[in-house]
Amino acid sequence: MKIDGPFYAQLSGAAGEARRLAQLGYDGVYTLEGSTDPFLPLVLAAEHAPGLDLATGIAVAFPRNPLHLAYQAWDLQKFSQGRFMLGIGSQVKAHIEKRFGVEFNPPAARMRDYI
């Protein structure tokens, strides 16, 4: 069985936190899109904890350009030597409209087009 855990580290402490979680025996870490970018801490985890699997759980899709997101995911996948898994989601209407300033549309059909 593999054990993954949330990776809440601020960017300035991400390298050390990734090493600490690897030493504790975690197999992987995932970031959440809260008050920080979900990708940048994973770059540092990829570099400083080469045994950890990495994931976004989740990155909000619709405020991002699909091509830009694909580049970010591909670059992180290459940099981590295949240890990255992209998790994307739609988020709720209030967050999409108020936090990100993007029009909310029914997410299922839009996500299909996005992917």
Label the predicted regions:
Residues 1-56:
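N-terminal beta1-alpha1-beta2 module of alpha/beta enzyme domains
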Residues 2-8, 63-115:
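Flexible, glycine-rich active-site loops centered on histidine and acidic residues
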Residues 27-30, 61, 103:
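Residue-level detector of alpha-helix boundaries and kinks
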Residues 33, 58, 88-90:
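Short secondary-structure boundary segments
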Residues 33-37, 54, 61-68, 110:
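Generic, well-ordered alpha-helical segments
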Residues 53-59, 85-86:
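A short, GP-enriched loop/loop-strand-helix hinge that lies immediately N-terminal to
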